[in-house]
């Protein structure tokens, strides 16, 4: 049984599909839902870390995803801002450290030979995760 669901978003249509699915799953199962944004950081060795998104952009991404989750029946969605050098590693590490038992990720609608391949973040999360991973598309 699922108790805690983590769903990353980057504001794309593909991640919105994952958010909607995760919200519906949480509503049906009674699981707690957390929506996260992974703010990928670059640099750092001798200089400051440079983040992909500003704090305001992270807040806007989370606000939009939480609103979407609410439209799909998920109450009391937790907001999580993860800073990591790599998106998949940040998602998996946060999920492990905080007791999540299900991760829902989005991936693009691919055609032809590329349909055999998942998006790199989704594939990396599936390969590294300690828990169930659902890929929504």
Language model region names:
Residues 3, 101, 130:
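Conserved acidic residues
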Residues 3-52, 70-72, 76-77:
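Small/aliphatic-rich secondary-structure junction motif
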Residues 37-39, 102, 106-108, 137:
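Short secondary-structure boundary segments
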Residues 50-61:
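A short acidic, glycine-rich active-site loop
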Residues 70-103:
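Structural beta-alpha unit
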Residues 102-127:
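Glycine-rich, Arg-bearing micro-motifs that act as flexible, cationic patches
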Residues 128-137:
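Short, acidic/small-residue loops that bind anionic groups at enzyme active sites
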């Amino acid at each position: 049984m699922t108790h805690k669901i983590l769903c990353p978003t980057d504001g794309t249509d593909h991640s919105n599909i994952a958010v909607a699915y995760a919200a519906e799953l949480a509503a049906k199962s009674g699981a707690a839902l957390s929506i996260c944004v992974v703010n990928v950081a670059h640099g750092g060795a001798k200089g400051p870390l440079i983040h992909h998104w500003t704090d305001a952009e992270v807040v806007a991404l989370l606000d939009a995803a939480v609103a979407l989750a609410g439209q799909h029946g998920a109450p009391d969605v937790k907001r999580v801002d993860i800073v990591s050098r790599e998106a998949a590693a940040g998602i998996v590490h946060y999920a492990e450290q905080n007791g999540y038992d299900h991760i829902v990720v989005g991936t693009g609608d691919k055609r032809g030979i590329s349909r055999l391949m998942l998006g790199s973040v989704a594939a990396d999360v599936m390969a590294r995760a300690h828990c169930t991973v659902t890929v929504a598309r």
